[in-house]
C-alpha cells in the first residue's frame, strides 16, 4: 500500500529539484508535500525494520548506484532504485550464508545480513567519491558577538576543577588515609578521561571551524573506526601485544584514505566529511561483524567500543596527558588558519595562506589527537561535538578562546561521565563513553532542531 502511495507522490516530488526560493516566488508551498513524503519513507522503514530487522546503508547505496549509472529522471530512479536495493540485499544475504558456512568451525552463529550490507555500501560510496569531484562551498559561519570571553574561560575551568575534585572523592572532604587508598586507582582513569576530553574537544573545534558544519566531530573523519578495525586485526593476528600497533595502523589507514580522496578535491570540507563517514561506516560494519561472530575475543572489542576508563594504566595515562599538553601548546599556531580558511579558497590565497597545505596540516593534527584518544578510551562520541558548542554558548566566539573553553569542557564532560558511571550502578560500572553518548544524544537532537 505504501509503495503505490510513493509512486502517486512522484509527480509532486519532481518539484524538489527546484530551489525553495523559486517555488516561493511562484507561490508554491511544498511543506505539506515534504512532510507527507517523509512520513511515507518513515513508514516504509518501520515496516522493513519490524519485519526483518535493521538493514543499514541500502537506502543510501542504491540511489548512489543508480546515479552512478547515469539514470537521472525521477520516474526511472523510482523504479531502478528498489531493484538495485533488492540486488544489494540479495548479494549480502548470499554472502552471509557463504561466509557462515566457510567459517562454521570458527564462529558459533550465522552472520546477520544487516551487518554485511554496509560493507559493499561503504566501499561503493568511497569509489564514487574517488571518481567524482565535489565542488567546494566556503563554510558558512554565523558572526557571533564576543561576549566577555574571560568569564567563559573561568566558568569552564571552575567546572573542570569541581569535576576533578569530586572524581577523587564523592564528597569535598578527603582525609589523608582515604587519599592514600584512592589515589593509586583513581588518578590514571581521571587523567585519562581528562586528557581524552581535551584532545577530542580541540579536534572538534578545528573540524567545526574548518568545515563550517556545527555537527562536525572527530568521529566524522572515520579515525576512531579505523583504530577499532586495527584493534580487531591485532586481536586476530597477535593477541593483546598487537593491539597498540594495530590501532595505530588502522588510524593511519583511515587518515591516509581521507587524505588521498580529499587531495583529489583540494581538501574541500564536504569531501573530507563524506570520506570519513563512508570509511567509518565500512569499518564499523567490520567491527560489528567481529562482535556478532561469537568469537570470545570479540568481548574485548565490545568492551573497548563502550569507551571504558577503568582499565587505564599509569603509563598510558601519562602518555595521553603528554599528547594533550602538546596539543594545547601547538593549538595557537593554527589560529590564523582557523580565522582565514572559513572565508574560502580565493580569500585565503589572497591573504597569503595556502589552503591545501593548511587543511592537510590541520587534518593530520586532528587525526593524531583522535587516534590517541581512541587508543586511550575507545571511540567516545559527543565529547568532541558538545564541548565547542558549550564554549560558544558561554560567549567564546574566537578560535583561541573557544579552544581553551572547549578543552576545559571536553575534559569536564568525560571526567563527570567517568564519575557518574562509577556511582550510578555501584558496585558495577558504566563505561564513560557509553554514558557520555547517552547524555549527549538529547543534546545532539536539540542541536539538529535549532540548526538552520
Annotate each PLM feature.
Residues 1-452:
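Alpha-helical transmembrane segments in inner-membrane proteins
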Amino acid at each position: 500500500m505504501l509503495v503505490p502511495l510513493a509512486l502517486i507522490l512522484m509527480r509532486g516530488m519532481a518539484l524538489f529539484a527546484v530551489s525553495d526560493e523559486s517555488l516561493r516566488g511562484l507561490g508554491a508551498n511544498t511543506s505539506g508535500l515534504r512532510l507527507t513524503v517523509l512520513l511515507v519513507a518513515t513508514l516504509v522503514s518501520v515496516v522493513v525494520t519490524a519485519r526483518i530487522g535493521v538493514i543499514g546503508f541500502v537506502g543510501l547505496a542504491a540511489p548512489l548506484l543508480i546515479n552512478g549509472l547515469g539514470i537521472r529522471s525521477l520516474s526511472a530512479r523510482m523504479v531502478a532504485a528498489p531493484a538495485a536495493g533488492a540486488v544489494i540485499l540479495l548479494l549480502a544475504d548470499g554472502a552471509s550464508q557463504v561466509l557462515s558456512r566457510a567459517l562454521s568451525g570458527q564462529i558459533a552463529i550465522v552472520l546477520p545480513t544487516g551487518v554485511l550490507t554496509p560493507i559493499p555500501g561503504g566501499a561503493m560510496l568511497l569509489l564514487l567519491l574517488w571518481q567524482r569531484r565535489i565542488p567546494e562551498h566556503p563554510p558558512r559561519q554565523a558572526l557571533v558577538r564576543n561576549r566577555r570571553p574571560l568569564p567563559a574561560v573561568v566558568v569552564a575551568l571552575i567546572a573542570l576543577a569541581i569535576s576533578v575534585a569530586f572524581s577523587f572523592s564523592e564528597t569535598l572532604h578527603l582525609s589523608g588515609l582515604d587519599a592514600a587508598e584512592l589515589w593509586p586507582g583513581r588518578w590514571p582513569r581521571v587523567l585519562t578521561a581528562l586528557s581524552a576530553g581535551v584532545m577530542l574537544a580541540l579536534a572538534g573545534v578545528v573540524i567545526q571551524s574548518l568545515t563550517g558544519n556545527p555537527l562536525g566531530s572527530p568521529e566524522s573523519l572515520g579515525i576512531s573506526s579505523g583504530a577499532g578495525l586495527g584493534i580487531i586485526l591485532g586481536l586476530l593476528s597477535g593477541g593483546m601485544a598487537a593491539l597498540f600497533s594495530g590501532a595505530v595502523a588502522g588510524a593511519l589507514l583511515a587518515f591516509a584514505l581521507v587524505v588521498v580522496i580529499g587531495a583529489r578535491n583540494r581538501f574541500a570540507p564536504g569531501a573530507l566529511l563524506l570520506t570519513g563517514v563512508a570509511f567509518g561506516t565500512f569499518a564499523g560494519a567490520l567491527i560489528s561483524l567481529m562482535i556478532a561472530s561469537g568469537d570470545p575475543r570479540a568481548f574485548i572489542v565490545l568492551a573497548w567500543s563502550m569507551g571504558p576508563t577503568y582499565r587505564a594504566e599509569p603509563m598510558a595515562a601519562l602518555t595521553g596527558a603528554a599528547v594533550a599538553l602538546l596539543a594545547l601548546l601547538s593549538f595557537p599556531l593554527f589560529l590564523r588558519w582557523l580565522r582565514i580558511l572559513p572565508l574560502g579558497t580565493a580569500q585565503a590565497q589572497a591573504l597569503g595562506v595556502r589552503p591545501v597545505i593548511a587543511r592537510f596540516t590541520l587534518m593530520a593534527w586532528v587525526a593524531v589527537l583522535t587516534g590517541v584518544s581512541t587508543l586511550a578510551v575507545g571511540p567516545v562520541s559527543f565529547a568532541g561535538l558538545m564541548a565547542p558548542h558549550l564554549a560558544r554558548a558561554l560567549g567564546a566566539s574566537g578560535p583561541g578562546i573557544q579552544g581553551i573553553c572547549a578543552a576545559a569542557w571536553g575534559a569536564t564532560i568525560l571526567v563527570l561521565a567517568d564519575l557518574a558511571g562509577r556511582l550510578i550502578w555501584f558496585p558495577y560500572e558504566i563505561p564513560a563513553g557509553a554514558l557520555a553518548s547517552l547524555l549527549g544524544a538529547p543534546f545532539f537532537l536539540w542541536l539538529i532542531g535549532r540548526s538552520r
